[in-house]
Amino acid sequence: MNPAIRTAALTKRYRRRLALHDCTVTVPAGRIVGLVGPNGAGKSTLLGLVCGMITPTSGSIEVLGHRPAAGAAQLSRVGFVAQDAPVYSRLTVAEHLRLGARLNPNWDDDLAQRRIRRRGLDPDQKAGALSGGQRAQLALTVAAAKRGDLLVLDEPVAALDPLARRAFLDDLLDFVDELAVGVVLSSHLLGDLEQVCDHLIVLAGGRVQLAGDVADLLAEHHRVTGAPDPDRLPAGARLIHAEQTRHETSMIVRCAGPVPGGTPVGLEGMTLAYLTAATPTPTGAPR
């Protein structure tokens, strides 16, 4: 089976600004991928390249074994939900579904109708009158009912309250189970990603800082607390980030084997260590 996404030295430049630089990742099919990074890290650029909305400056990218947006058949295999869950405010819920059926050859109207009923959306309600959570549900339903092989979601829950976010993520997991579809989910909300993702890509400064299956990454990362002595780390260990207080140092360490005094680190702590290490610190500021 082809990987969902494969990139090699993928680079995107806007005039003098490098939005994405030398990005090399392989995402196995069927994964729920969390894409994390600060504003300006290159997340939306990478998603735009995956969906074929923009073209790379250099390097290569394959999505589901083919060039992104290589034709109508390839486009139908990828469902996309952009930031703020864009919908047509003057169209009703039912009109969105009819439009989806007209534009997508593999449209699953039964799936779309069931999901709309489950979330209590009025088919005659115009999208502009829906709540933020309802608009997100409608956008996700339209993307999933394409019956593609990959869903690409660009910060779809950023503006939602906790209950609406939970409902959205529940539906997303239902779609994954029912359709055997892969997902790339960009988000700043690490707690949400920790609940649903089994693969992680961390971007900062347009570069990949970390990528891999979550279970494997967590097994290789450890928190070591105590007196600041990196020399006591085993051979092959890599210090990712250290934070020092008046009395001790807390270090996030990557090592394939056991680390003396090491304790498990969660996805949030691991991710923040890489993001902090990749962020320039103003002169004189504490690290």
Regions found by a protein language model. Give the residues of each.
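ABC-family P-loop ATPase nucleotide-binding domains
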Residues: 83-138
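Conserved ABC transporter NBD signature motif
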Residues: 59-74
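Catalytic Walker B motif of ABC-type/P-loop ATPase nucleotide-binding domains
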Residues: 151-155, 160
